Amino acid sequence: LEYKLQIKRTPCRVEIILKESEFKMRYELFKRLNTGGEGLSRQEIRNCIFRGLDSRYSEFIAELAQNDIFREIVNISVSNEEKMYYEELVLRYLTLKNKGTRYSQANIQDYMDDYLESQCKEFDDTQIETDKTLFVNIMKILEKLKDENIFKLGKRYFTTSMYDAIMLSLSENMIDLEELNIEQLGKKIAILKEDDNFNKYVGSA
């Protein structure tokens, strides 16, 4: 009886979200409701919210995240895969490549949110094909390097800073890379990883 009375006396807050409600308001409310129990990852929230805006860009991200070479090199845990970390890494790369590496938001997650929202609102088929071709070509190059630790700091753990540096460098220099043999590229990456300034940046990021 005591518990029943407590339940009856506990206020229940109701939030009404209309279809025409401002998008950011709906997104913020969804994030706030995602508390207690096992919360969703940021990418899982994006997958729920932004598909309601336009599902095509999320489907494009999911397609790239299924790339066999990409998954073999990144090689995350099952739990992280379930939290859509492959998709988050693809979105991270596309955001930094297409929107730049400098951002005014509090953190890169907010920056990625803004980028994904903009792509959903202004879907560009031509840009999609360009990004897809480039991503696939980068993966083919990485496969030829035969380095399963390429995104790792030493041989210890995957680091997003190493991932960002290598993915963005390859995407910005693809034309030059076509004339560079794989052995030379591997040596250049190895030299980069041994650079003290680079390691200082990667280790602190």
Question: What does each model-found stretch correspond to?
Answer:
Residues 1-113, 179, 183-191, 197-204:
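Basic- and aromatic-enriched surface patches that contact anionic nucleotides/nucleic acids
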Residues 62-79, 135-153:
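Short amphipathic alpha-helical segments and their helix-coil junctions
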Residues 79-83, 128, 156:
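Conserved phosphate/pyrophosphate-binding and hydrolysis machinery centered on Walker-type P-loop NTPases
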Residues 105-139, 145-151, 155, 162:
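Small-residue-rich helix-loop
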